[in-house]
Amino acid sequence: MTVTAQQGDATLEQEISAVGKESPLPALASLHDLQYFDSLQTFSYSTSPTANQAFTDFSGVEELSHLERFSMNGARPETLEPLSHLSQLKQLSLTECGTLDLTPLEGLEQLESLTLSSNDRIVSLEPVTKLPALRSLSLSSGTAVPSLEPLAQTNLAVLDLGLGVGQSGLYKEIDYSPLSQLPDLVCLNLTNHTRVTTKFCKQILAHSPDLRFLNIQNTPASEGSALDVEYLRAYTEADLLKRLANKLRNTFG
């Protein structure tokens, strides 16, 4: 179990390693005590989902009006409503958190980065269309979604949909066409998506002029020779990194 909290320039980090089967400290059960850290800017908590199934309530975090970064791994929140009060939140990571309804996140106007990797399911991606500053979204490592259609209404620069080996079935009924409607894309990860073809990749390239990183490892497109990406090779590695840095700087400020 790892807990990290940052307040201003001071960082408190606590790492607990269990020698036997039991941890020296009980698993986190409540966030209410965080109210005493009223200037907290960063909070991160990670534990095994099986060891922390009782942690289902995010209540208390709404008191952290200065919080900019919140990361939680292994919880099973019944609702994300407490997060809706974090008006300064810029980065949010919820991993291995079961099934998530993102509706309470609507209106987080400062949120730039949202990581939802390794969850069971996202009820709907519609709420991400109500996040005007969102530029980076990760749904990697087996997080199931009902549709990618809402993504066409976003201004994403970074999108990670990478799957693990054997997870391609999660997308067997998914319409990929919204991915060709993201003109601001810089980075796209489609690893292990077995329905991604060369033809579709051409559509993405045609409609995403800023795209510089496209991962199609273990897809049908990676086996074809017809995918014309010569314009991507026209830049040196240093130039690519410079362009990406400038793009992300303009995106995230």
For the regions a language model picked out, list residue spans one by one.
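Concave beta-strand-loop units of leucine-rich repeat
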Residues: M1-G60, H66-P104, Q110-P178, D184-G224, ...
